[in-house]
Amino acid sequence: MPAAAVQEAVGVCSYGMQLSWDINDPQMPQELALFDQFREWPDGYVRFIYSSDEKKAQRHLSGWAMRNTNNHNGHILKKSCLGVVVCTQACTLPDGSRLQLRPAICDKARLKQQKKACPNCHSALELIPCRGHSGYPVTNFWRLDGNAIFFQAKGVHDHPRPESKSETEARRSAIKRQMASFYQPQKKRIRESEAEENQDSSGHFSNIPPLENPEDFDIVTETSFPIPGQPCPSFPKSDVYKATCDLATFQGDKMPPFQKYSSPRIYLPRPPCSYELANPGYTNSSPYPTLYKDSTSIPNDTDWVHLNTLQCNVNSYSSYERSFDFTNKQHGWKPALGKPSLVERTNHGQFQAMATRPYYNPELPCRYLTTPPPGAPALQTVITTTTKVSYQAYQPPAMKYSDSVREVKSLSSCNYAPEDTGMSVYPEPWGPPVTVTRAASPSGPPPMKIAGDCRAIRPTVAIPHEPVSSRTDEAETWDVCLSGLGSAVSYSDRVGPFFTYNNEDF
């Protein structure tokens, strides 16, 4: 049927064709009583008036593939036809129809669609554009005015009809269902195979029967390998080796006779000495191992200092300094002059004075005269009322320095005692003056008694030649205090200078 005849038949049947109006008129017909039926495939120069309640008209629905086009009038919606996508081989479907796909609205999607193969014959696809409006695409116009929606088409489609939008949606949904039915069993089989593999991998250990009597098997741990359950070697606690300061038992101690040497010296060890504090409230922070001295069996160690007639081992010392060394890297005294004294008191300390084999270090040739001049006592006793026994260095009147040895010419106000003489101290807490009994050997002089506190001054010793930085660290004193509540060891450097070198005091 010719297009003019179709247009005439549609125009005769259309109510909108009976009225004279154009989509661009400023004033549209008003008070409309009749409306046209919705047309999905309008073709040619036609006009329709739809009711504003028509759902398809509200969506601007059309069977042709139409896209929105720019329009300067905001009240008028302009759409143009895209054409149709067909197979290049003009293949036919099983029902005998031709493949005529609906072109995609988006430009990029339309280009991708053209690169795809024909779903029927897998040949190439091509787009047939619409040129039905004087060489341009057929244009449709939509306008809402009052209670009516006005539609006007310009041009005749010169291409076959594509799939309608409803048909395209139905086809796509069918394809999706088909693909889902194809991939769902495959995914299910993949999941089942993965589950079987997991069961197989875990089945190696699941087939092992459990132990019937686990208590029959004993676990033997290697004692040489440190484990969390086995404590690692650590520093011994101080309260284990704490010496009780019992006055009754302390009075029964007696020193063995001292050993006599031809050349009395002060033997100081090269490595630093460490002392264990007898107070359980402090922990040992010294990097050196703790040395414990047993009164019954004394090993040959480097903790003993031989001072001609007195050898002492200090187990109570400063709680702030777990370890101090008598010899630093330059073999000098570690604390320097001017430093604050380290005076600490402990509740359970013990001062032991007994003989042991001295440690000889040839790098420290320190000696002093063994036979002092008459009238110069070796030890000066000072009696006080605080029951404090301290040994301090006595300042000599003169001292001569040589390359390797400093010798003391005279020791004034000192009493010399034989080297084989033992001494026992009998302190009494907070009572009358204490007496110090000096027990003599069979060949020594009779014991002497000293009332009150015993304050002994040790002789000044000579230190080998060292740099100035180390010589300034050579003035220290030891104060050993005994009281009724405990003992105190004071490592004091507050004494004035007693070494003289080149008319300079150190």
Swiss-Prot record:
PROSITE patterns: GCM. Residues 379-395 are annotated as: C-terminal conserved inhibitory domain (CCID). Its main location: nucleus. Changing R110W: In FIH2; abolishes DNA binding ability. GO terms for molecular function: DNA binding; DNA-binding transcription activator activity, RNA polymerase II-specific; DNA-binding transcription factor activity, RNA polymerase II-specific; metal ion binding; RNA polymerase II cis-regulatory region sequence-specific DNA binding; sequence-specific DNA binding; sequence-specific double-stranded DNA binding. Zn(2+) 1 binds at C81, C130, H157, H159. GO terms for cellular component: chromatin; nucleus. GO terms for biological process: gliogenesis; intracellular calcium ion homeostasis; intracellular phosphate ion homeostasis; parathyroid gland development; regulation of transcription by RNA polymerase II; transcription by RNA polymerase II. It is found in: Nucleus. Disulfide bonds: none annotated. It holds the Pfam family GCM. Transcription factor that binds specific sequences on gene promoters and activate their transcription. Through the regulation of gene transcription, may play a role in parathyroid gland development. This is Chorion-specific transcription factor GCMb. The gene is GCM2.
